[in-house]
Regions:
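Active-site-lining helix/loop region of Rossmann-like oxidoreductase modules
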Residues: 5, 133-263
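N-terminal Rossmann-fold NAD(P) dinucleotide-binding loop
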Residues: 11-12
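Aromatic pocket-lining residues of Rossmann-like dinucleotide-binding sites
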Residues: 18
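NAD(P)-binding Rossmann-fold cofactor-contacting core
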Residues: 25-42
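Short acidic low-complexity segments
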Residues: 48-59
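Beta-loop-alpha module in the N-terminal Rossmann-like domain of NAD(P)-dependent dehydrogenases
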Residues: 63-79, 93-96
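Rossmann-fold NAD(P)-binding glycine/threonine-rich loop
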Residues: 90-112
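C-terminal active-site/capping subdomain that shapes the small-molecule cofactor and substrate pocket
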Residues: 227-326
């Protein structure tokens, strides 16, 4: 049995992904019962095993996907304490750090906690692990993200441009003002090129955990001049129900046959769709015991079946595009 905590944009995409691929029961909970019931009713036409439920019923699930706004730590602590595995889609640095601290709780209760199972972080970890197979060794990873999922994701993007970015540079964590460090990043079509800036993103923290050999890790997010100017003010324009076409760019640098090599791969898809498919595939793997080890993990870690998970994500319609040189 798989539970979904939150029936917004990401939660709906998780439910859609699971209703097609999974043959297990799916429980949907949202603070707005009407939203959860509407989602379950819509998907019940293709999967009769999905239904809306109350919060306490989720304790019966084997794994719960936290698809609502951050913070996820209090909710994750609640479920882990009941022995329920958790898949978190949070992309907030402080929240991810707090989730990592729940590793002992997960181990004590023989539960699995997956942190950052979204687009970035999440899909980015899969792509780094996949690209690393073409190198003798890797030492740099640079992530860029364009677009947002639902309204909560848009608000997080707004906050990410007003805080402090974090990056791993030659053996130490460096903090820089978010919104600085402009870099033109090319994403797969139809997204194209966007100016990207440092942001308060958890990718460097989680990527470094999955790949301890890295010397440099950075993460940037696309932003317009207006985004940067108003980043330190409350959002003046209400966010849209769902963002448009998004993009993810993963650049890996390392050595192969004694030469310096750079490889780049990208994804062009709605951010909420990628997050929903990734977290749904991870939850399904936990539900069928493909992932069974207790403790806290991030996607891309060598102890996880990353290749199988990435194959499942791509089979669900999320395609990766390699950048080729003329």
């Amino acid at each position: 049995m798989i539970g979904i905590f939150g029936a917004g944009v990401v939660g709906a995409r998780v439910a859609e992904s699971l209703s097609i691929e999974s043959q297990t029961s799916i429980l949907v909970y949202d603070s707005s019962q009407i939203v959860a019931q509407r989602l379950a009713r819509r998907l019940s036409e293709t999967n009769s095993l999905i239904k809306a439920t109350n919060r306490s019923e989720l304790h019966r699930a084997k794994v719960v996907v936290l698809a609502g706004p951050s913070p996820h730590t209090p909710v994750a602590k609640e479920f882990l304490g009941k022995g329920v595995s958790v898949v978190s889609t949070s992309d907030d640095i402080a929240d991810c750090l707090n989730l990592l601290s729940l590793s002992d709780l997960a181990t004590e209760n023989k539960a699995t906690l997956i942190i950052g199972a979204a687009s970035s972080p999440g899909m980015s970890g899969f792509l780094v692990r996949n690209l690393s197979k073409g190198f003798d060794s890797i030492d740099e990873v640079h992530i860029a993200l364009h677009g947002t999922g639902g309204p909560a994701c848009a608000r997080q993007h707004h906050r990410a441009l007003s805080g402090q970015s974090i990056g791993w540079h030659d053996g130490e964590w460096l903090r820089r003002p978010a919104g600085s460090g402009r870099e033109l990043c090319w994403f797969p079509e139809p997204v194209g090129a966007y100016d990207c800036y440092r942001g308060e993103l958890p990718d460097p923290l989680l990527i470094k955990r999955a790949f301890p050999e890295l010397v440099r890790v950075t993460a940037r997010v696309s932003a317009t001049r207006r985004d940067r100017v108003f980043a330190r003010l409350p959002m003046l324009i209400p966010p849209r129900a769902e963002g448009g076409m998004g993009g993810l760019r993963v650049e890996v640098r390392g050595t192969k046959n004694g030469e310096r090599v750079v490889d780049v791969v990208g994804v062009a898809e709605r951010v909420g769709q990628v997050a929903g498919v990734v977290s749904g595939c991870v939850a399904r793997s936990i539900s069928v015991s493909e992932i069974s080890q207790p403790g806290a993990f991030v996607l891309g870690e060598s102890s996880l079946p990353n290749e199988a998970l990435l194959s499942r994500v791509m089979a669900s319609g999320v395609q990766a595009h390699s950048f080729v040189r003329a």
